[in-house]
Amino acid sequence: MALKITQVKGLVGTKPKQRDSMRSLGLKRIGQTVVREDNPIVRGQINTVRHMVEVEEVAGE
């Protein structure tokens, strides 16, 4: 199982921990989409920035 993560809000005015989570997920700009493996580490990063991203589950890797 994999997760398709899309950034929907910008990073201006966010806390450093949130910016670090977005960077480690590989998101830099609004509208950018990445696919990441579904694991507890990625889920925790998504939880930190859940108000700035949209997440979909996709089959495969």
Curated annotation (Swiss-Prot):
The keyword Transmembrane does not apply. InterPro entries: Ribo_uL30_ferredoxin-like_sf, Ribosomal_uL30_bac-type, Ribosomal_uL30_ferredoxin-like. One of its GO terms (cellular component) is cytosolic large ribosomal subunit. GO terms for biological process: translation. The keyword Transmembrane helix does not apply. Gene3D superfamilies: Ribosomal protein L30, ferredoxin-like fold domain. NCBIfam families: rpmD_bact. Part of the 50S ribosomal subunit. HAMAP family: Ribosomal_uL30_B. This is Large ribosomal subunit protein uL30. It comes from Corynebacterium jeikeium (strain K411).
